[in-house]
């Protein structure tokens, strides 16, 4: 059985991790070809 604490930690960390990866990928994209296209 899954412990409530472990379940809460996973549910808390997963969205933060996905958000962090998305933001870092978006920043790298903007820093790369995205900036050239905007200019």
Curated annotation (Swiss-Prot):
The chain crosses the membrane at residues 5-25. One of its GO terms (cellular component) is plasma membrane-derived thylakoid membrane. Its main location: membrane. The keyword Transport applies. One of its GO terms (biological process) is cytochrome complex assembly. Keywords: Electron transport, Membrane, Photosynthesis, Thylakoid, Transmembrane, Transmembrane helix, Transport. The keyword DNA-binding does not apply. It is found in: Cellular thylakoid membrane. It holds the Pfam family PetG. One of its GO terms (molecular function) is electron transporter, transferring electrons within cytochrome b6/f complex of photosystem II activity. Component of the cytochrome b6-f complex, which mediates electron transfer between photosystem II (PSII) and photosystem I (PSI), cyclic electron flow around PSI, and state transitions. PetG is required for either the stability or assembly of the cytochrome b6-f complex. The 4 large subunits of the cytochrome b6-f complex are cytochrome b6, subunit IV (17 kDa polypeptide, PetD), cytochrome f and the Rieske protein, while the 4 small subunits are PetG, PetL, PetM and PetN. The complex functions as a dimer. Belongs to the PetG family. This is Cytochrome b6-f complex subunit 5. It comes from Prochlorococcus marinus subsp. pastoris (strain CCMP1986 / NIES-2087 / MED4).
């Amino acid at each position: 059985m899954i412990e409530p604490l472990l379940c809460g930690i996973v549910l808390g960390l997963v969205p933060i991790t996905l958000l962090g990866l998305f933001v870092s990928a978006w920043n790298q994209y903007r820093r790369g070809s995205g900036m050239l296209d905007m200019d």
